[in-house]
């Protein structure tokens, strides 16, 4: 009887070790190495490729030379929303949010270019790709905050003095944040910016009052991001690291004030010199 108890405990321990060890490789799967059927309904399409944790190389760069960036991928992992305090003596702080959007939060297939000036300042210019995703997070109190996760027209620069792309380089810059809703979007009362009703109240004289959200707008916001390179593979031109982005949330076509949203995650890209 005692032997059977020890055997069951030993088997349970082995099963736990196997489960723990199997979690590592599962997270390191490269979606580019899988077929459509292997990715379908698994969430792997939302994962960015990864580089080995032991990769610590560098990619030499020269002033006046242009380098292309392909397959830039940003995978968000943490979300925070700036919440105003109830007490005026307290300061506003970021509250963690729970992701409600499934499997469609990563930015990928983004392309751009990198230039280097005489002072060793490395500049990254974002040019295009799947560079936006509508995302919604929920705060602990139940409030839902939608925002337009993007890095459109990002211009990120480093400190001077770099002659290579290595694990100590950090791109920081600003980008545009388009409106979460388009000009032809209609609200539940059929009102829009370029189409739909002008107002949805009984008295036309009150149609321009902001309290009724009749005046629709599609404002362009501004965000900032920091791309910190932590891994570089000189042989393949691959780089990877972590990012920290801050941007405004949705304004419901100008009906409410935006709140600040902070997104943290990992990124991956390939750098090649101009032919």
Swiss-Prot record:
Q: Does the keyword DNA damage apply?
A: no
Question: Can you name one GO molecular function term for this protein?
Answer: oxygen evolving activity
User: Can you quote a single GO CC term?
Assistant: plasma membrane-derived thylakoid membrane
In Swiss-Prot or TrEMBL terms, this protein is called Photosystem II extrinsic protein O
Membrane topology field: Peripheral membrane protein
The residues the entry assigns to the signal sequence are 1-28
Query: Tell me, how does this one assemble?
Result: PSII is composed of 1 copy each of membrane proteins PsbA, PsbB, PsbC, PsbD, PsbE, PsbF, PsbH, PsbI, PsbJ, PsbK, PsbL, PsbM, PsbT, PsbX, PsbY, PsbZ, Psb30/Ycf12, peripheral proteins PsbO, CyanoQ (PsbQ), PsbU, PsbV and a large number of cofactors. It forms dimeric complexes.
Gene (name only): psbO
> What InterPro entries does this protein map onto?
OMP/PagP_b-brl, PsbO
């Amino acid at each position: 009887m005692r032997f059977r108890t020890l055997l069951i405990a030993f088997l349970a321990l082995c099963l736990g070790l196997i489960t723990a060890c199997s979690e590592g490789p599962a997270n390191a799967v490269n979606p580019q190495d899988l077929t459509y059927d292997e990715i379908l309904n698994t969430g792997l399409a939302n994962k960015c490729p990864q580089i080995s944790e032991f990769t610590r190389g560098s990619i030499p760069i020269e002033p006046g030379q242009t380098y292309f960036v392909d397959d830039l991928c940003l995978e968000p992992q943490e979300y925070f929303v700036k919440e105003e305090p109830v007490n005026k003596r307290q300061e506003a702080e970021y509250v963690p949010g729970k992701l409600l959007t499934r499997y469609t939060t990563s930015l990928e297939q983004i392309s751009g270019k990198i230039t280097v000036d005489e002072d060793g300042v490395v500049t990254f210019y974002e040019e295009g790709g799947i560079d936006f995703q509508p995302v919604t997070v929920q705060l602990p109190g139940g409030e839902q905050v939608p925002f337009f996760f993007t890095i459109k027209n990002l211009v990120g620069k480093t400190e001077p003095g770099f002659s290579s792309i290595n694990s100590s380089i950090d791109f920081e810059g600003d980008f545009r944040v388009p409106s979460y809703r388009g000009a032809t979007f209609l609200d539940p009362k059929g009102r829009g910016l370029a189409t739909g009703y002008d107002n949805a109240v009984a008295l036309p004289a009150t149609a321009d009052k902001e309290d009724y959200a009749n005046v629709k707008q599609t404002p362009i916001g501004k965000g900032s991001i920091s791309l910190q390179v932590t891994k570089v593979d000189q042989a393949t031109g691959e780089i990877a690291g972590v990012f920290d982005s801050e941007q405004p949330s949705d304004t419901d076509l100008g009906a409410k004030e935006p709140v600040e949203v902070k997104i943290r995650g990992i990124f991956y890209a390939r750098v090649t010199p101009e032919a």
